């Protein structure tokens, strides 16, 4: 069970990181490397902090993932990563600042991902 906790921790961190990165980047104007100077960073500090926090979330997620792999067989652990696809979709359509639309097809896709994860991690019924 310890491995699943680490795996879920990794999924939650990577999901939050992705949503934070999206917010930071969608609120940062288009730029080139030449545009980045102290004034630009100061003017867009919340966005840069969000991007840095998102990258840190990815790093922490990877650390959790290392521990998940230590305790879980790969054929059980790896499908857990797919949870983040469904969770990011739910976050993107639920949080008003993203203004992303939910469609039946996308929602069904997220549902199938969840169903697949459940099927892979369900123990087979023992035959007597």
From Swiss-Prot:
Membrane topology, Cytoplasmic segments: 1-5, 69-77, 123-128
SUPFAM superfamilies assigned to the protein according to its UniProt record, in alphabetical order: Multidrug resistance efflux transporter EmrE
Pathway(s) of this molecule:
Bacterial outer membrane biogenesis; lipopolysaccharide biosynthesis
**Protein name, UniProt field:** Probable 4-amino-4-deoxy-L-arabinose-phosphoundecaprenol flippase subunit ArnF
Origin species: Yersinia enterocolitica serotype O:8 / biotype 1B (strain NCTC 13174 / 8081)
Please give the InterPro entries that the UniProt record associates with this protein. Flippase_ArnF, Small_drug/metabolite_transptr
Asked if the keyword Transport belongs to this entry, the reply reads yes
Topological domain ranges for the Periplasmic compartment = 27-47, 99-101
Member of which family? Belongs to the ArnF family.
Q: Which gene encodes it?
A: arnF
Q: Which UniProt keywords apply?
A: Cell inner membrane, Cell membrane, Lipid A biosynthesis, Lipid biosynthesis, Lipid metabolism, Lipopolysaccharide biosynthesis, Membrane, Transmembrane, Transmembrane helix, Transport
Q: How does it assemble?
A: Heterodimer of ArnE and ArnF.
Q: Which NCBIfam families match?
A: PRK02971.1-2 (NF002816)
Q: Which HAMAP family match?
A: Flippase_ArnF
Return the Gene3D superfamilies for the record.
1.10.3730.20
Per UniProt, subcellular location reads as:
Cell inner membrane
Keyword check for Glycoprotein, yes or no.
Answer: no
Show the GO cellular component annotation of the record.
Answer: plasma membrane
- PANTHER family (alphabetical): 4-AMINO-4-DEOXY-L-ARABINOSE-PHOSPHOUNDECAPRENOL FLIPPASE SUBUNIT ARNF-RELATED, SMR FAMILY PROTON-DEPENDENT DRUG EFFLUX TRANSPORTER SUGE
Q: How does it sit in the membrane?
A: Multi-pass membrane protein
- State a single Gene Ontology molecular function: carbohydrate derivative transmembrane transporter activity
- Stated role: Translocates 4-amino-4-deoxy-L-arabinose-phosphoundecaprenol (alpha-L-Ara4N-phosphoundecaprenol) from the cytoplasmic to the periplasmic side of the inner membrane.
